[in-house]
Amino acid sequence: MGKFTYDINRYEPKQMVALPLCLLILSVIFLAFNTVSTGMPVEPGIDFAGGVAVTLSTSDSVDVIEDYFADYPLKISESDVAAGYLVFNYLEGDSFKDLTEHITARYPDATIYQMGETFGKTLQSQAIWALLFAFVLMAIVVFVAFRIFIPSVAVVLSAFSDIVITAAFMDVFGLTLSLGTTAALLMLIGYSVDSDVLLTTRLLKRQGKVDEKFRGAFRTGIIMTTTTLAAVVVMFIVFSLGQVTLIRDISAVLIIGLIIDMMNTWMLNAGLLKWYVKKGGK
């Protein structure tokens, strides 16, 4: 890693865990406020909330498109509108028929897709259960693998923090919770645990000085994460230029999550493990 080294002796455990824990607490408060206000911690996309999705190819500006649909419940997202992807609130009967006629009158080649509210809520429930089930299974595997309480809790807490903080940033950046972004969060559970398990395994099951084991784990772990991050950034750029919103949103969530994971692994998890070792844990 050249001159970029990881000095575990530079900070005390309390200093290492302070920033990740503050961000985690703020994220929990933010998501809880959203849940009380809207019923969901992150704004649901059309997959979960229901609505009308329209894909069209046009040279019209964002302002022109917004003006044309001023009488309809268009959810404004300039990046999506500029890419020719429009989302409207759920409409029934004559309202949906009027919208369809209004769209085809100006954009005859547009693709129109409607998701029902009831089916969307069913998918929403299934996605939440999938996230919970995946996280619980991950926690069980970690506890079975290490069989030591504090290090296992550190890994699980780090992964939990990754998901919660990433979800908060999703809402800040206007990324909705959809089937695609839910899949990204599921992938993030696996990505985040990799470096945590590497660090914990190196520290608990290898011989040598503690600071050397930390540095060795850091060199390997940071290479793993940055190479994955580089690939995901390229994916984000390519599919943003290609206006493929689903893959763009998946890669955006992964970029946020991987950056958060580096903080949680090498500050939160490492800080807890350092405290555990200083207290005499092996």
Curated annotation (Swiss-Prot):
Coiled coil: none annotated. Pfam families: SecD_SecF_C (PF02355). InterPro entries: SecD/SecF_arch_bac (IPR022813), SecD_SecF_C (IPR048634), SecF_arc (IPR024921). Part of the protein translocation apparatus. Forms a complex with SecD. Keywords: Cell membrane, Membrane, Protein transport, Translocation, Transmembrane, Transmembrane helix, Transport. SUPFAM superfamilies: Multidrug efflux transporter AcrB transmembrane domain. Belongs to the SecD/SecF family. SecF subfamily. It comes from the Archaea. GO terms for biological process: intracellular protein transmembrane transport; protein targeting. This is Protein-export membrane protein SecF. Involved in protein export. It is found in: Cell membrane. The chain crosses the membrane at residues 16-36, 126-146, 148-168, 169-189, 221-241, 253-273. It is a multi-pass membrane protein. NCBIfam families: PRK08578.1-2 (NF006354). GO terms for cellular component: plasma membrane.
